[in-house]
Amino acid sequence: MRTSFVTMLALGAAAVSAAPAAPVTDLVERGSSCTFTTAEAAKAGKGSCSTIVLDNIKVPAGETLDLTKLKSGTQVVFKGETSFGYKEWTGPLVSFSGSNIHVSGAAGHVINGGGPSWWDGKGTNGGKKKPKFFYAHHLDDSTISGLNVKNTPVQGFSILADRLTLDHITIDNSEGDAKGGHNTDAFDVGSSTFITISNANIKNQDDCLAINSGSNIKFVGGTCSGGHGISIGSVGLRDNNIVKDVTISDSTVINSDNGVRVKTIYQATGAVSGVTFSNIKLSNIAKYGIVIEQDYENGSPTGKPTNGVPISELTIENVTGTLKSSATEVYILCGNGSCKNWKWAGNSLSGGKKSGKCGNVPAGASC
């Protein structure tokens, strides 16, 4: 039996119309791109896109811009101004998780945390309840690059991840100097491995970097201004109290309370080992150029060091620069026998005063 050409066309059309719709997973694999203009739409549709553009999103008060559990390989781009409604709560304002995720910012974008609405000079120590800014928790084998951030209410990036790189992150909280910004840490790292933070440009009122636990962490090429300097710790009294194999290098700390510091907690246990500070330039430091102490309690030094968190294999080399006349150039206060095998070379600080209160300084170090 012969089939006419018209009949063949009809059969072909029927076959096409009967073809099932591509499943969501196929859309991701084929490179679908989605642009979202609301936080609600982004949360609902994030699983259907391989590229997500967040376009001028205004996140409602008390809600998180939720980019957790993204499909592997997803790219996320912040475009325009991302802003957040005001409410007293703990946050976070933004949250990401997933594997092989790549987060970046389009030209001219800004993520505005709205800090002045919360700032009251008290940070997380009282007053208004303030949201943390950005959780990179379980964001593994991923990158965050080229983000421009302004006015975080309190802490900026909370990092709990493995093999995460953050490059060219700018955080400008300089308005907080006059408007009550406090506890505006830029990067807090805990229980993480193989973290690299490169080329950061930070203006804030607390630590530029604080590593509380983790291993194989690098901070390189950073500029830190206005805060408390670059810190290890405080280490102790957490679930994880081990800091190991950290390199902080080729960075600048200016107009800050401290240059570089290592802090461990009074009567706590843990360990700090294999930490290197190298080629750090300091300028106009107000309190301490280099400070290492084992006496912290409730966020403040006690003057009574303990030895439960030993600091070993510490290298401080080529830390140079200027301090205010009221600042102390170097302060070291260790517990009995808990600081050992340090390398100290090429450090040169001027303008400040010598400390008369150092204790248990290990061989090779200078105080």
UniProtKB/Swiss-Prot annotation:
InterPro entries noted in UniProt: Glyco_hydro_28, Glycosyl_hydrlase_28, PbH1, Pectin_lyas_fold, Pectin_lyase_fold/virulence
Record flagged with keyword Glycoprotein: yes
Keyword presence, Repeat: yes
Cited SUPFAM superfamilies: Pectin lyase-like (SSF51126)
Residues bearing glycans: 318, 336
Keyword terms, alphabetized: Cell wall biogenesis/degradation, Disulfide bond, Glycoprotein, Glycosidase, Hydrolase, Repeat, Secreted, Signal
Compartments in which it is found: Secreted
Stretch forming the signal peptide: 1-18
Catalytic activity: (1,4-alpha-D-galacturonosyl)n+m + H2O = (1,4-alpha-D-galacturonosyl)n + (1,4-alpha-D-galacturonosyl)m
Family assignment from sequence similarity: Belongs to the glycosyl hydrolase 28 family.
PANTHER family hit by this protein: ENDOPOLYGALACTURONASE B, POLYGALACTURONASE
Name of the protein in question: Polygalacturonase
Name of the gene this protein is made from: PG1
